[in-house]
């Protein structure tokens, strides 16, 4: 468990919006990033429930109490390992997911929920900053080639998992650039294209 009294002593704090007079000059993301130290305190609000309903609320089944505890303790390396165990692209979901896990959070029964989405986002951003997002190379190649049709988030996740299993993967898309919905359906103020390109660079190494 993280901080046993964290949910009582630490109030929920969500990221602040950038000033309007600044936002109207660009198409960058609306919210200001929160510091790692700030998110450590927010992670301490997790109760590590006996039955963590956030698991059932999360479509991916993310191991939320585990990486909340690791972030609170400052173990960023193990935290990103636990996050990547169930989520190929937390930098996408940390920005775009409507966070049903927070609605399911047990803390929310009597007070405000843990800021799970922001903790997830800061965990992956810290991992990129520290160089802890590295390709997982297969021990051996299977000699099989797999075609993935469509380069949206599902196609990219499939390609990543198949590559890790040792297959040679070719991704096809009708558009000029890879990314699908992430590139052509999500506006820049929700997720900047540089975030997608950063992950694609990591996947093609």
PLM region descriptions:
Residues 1-145, 193:
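Ferredoxin-type iron-sulfur electron-transfer modules and their immediate structural context
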Residues 49, 149, 172-174:
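Generic beta-strand/beta-sheet core signal
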Residues 80-87, 119, 182-205:
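N-terminal Rossmann-like dinucleotide/flavin-binding domain of flavoprotein oxidoreductases
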Residues 88, 110, 152-154, 177:
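Residue-level detector of alpha-helix initiation sites
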Residues 145-170:
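N-terminal Rossmann-like FAD-binding beta1-loop-alpha1 element of flavoenzymes
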Residues 167-183:
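Glycine-rich FAD pyrophosphate-binding loop
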